[in-house]
Amino acid sequence: MVQSVSAIRRVSRLRRHARLRKKVSGTSERPRLVVNRSARHIHVQLVNDVTGTTVAAASSIEADVRGLQGDKKVRSVRVGQLIAERAKAAGINTVVFDRGGYTYGGRIAALADSVRENGLNF
């Protein structure tokens, strides 16, 4: 059975994410910073796994991020700034980073660096 390269990459990412989720869980004091990436956008949520609730969220679909000039990394940096601001407003200083099975580089690394620069600790 021959699969496309994109199908193989997707399955590999889901396997990596499943392995990661065995080890990573968020609490109310230290929620999980979940990253979801598509070809055009990036979405980030702070999730409390104990109650199953989303504490804060940010996305590149939001109006102030959509209007930015530049490539997708610039938007990822802005999304990182937004989620850090919203986390601080919710009284959160420390998070657990869940990269969602994506390799740590490019937009994911830019987002993580931006979150750290804006005051959240991993």
UniProtKB/Swiss-Prot annotation:
One of its GO terms (cellular component) is cytosolic large ribosomal subunit. GO terms for biological process: translation. It comes from the Bacteria. Part of the 50S ribosomal subunit; part of the 5S rRNA/L5/L18/L25 subcomplex. Contacts the 5S and 23S rRNAs. GO terms for molecular function: 5S rRNA binding; structural constituent of ribosome. CDD domains: Ribosomal_L18_L5e. The gene is rplR. This is Large ribosomal subunit protein uL18. Keywords: Ribonucleoprotein, Ribosomal protein, RNA-binding, rRNA-binding.
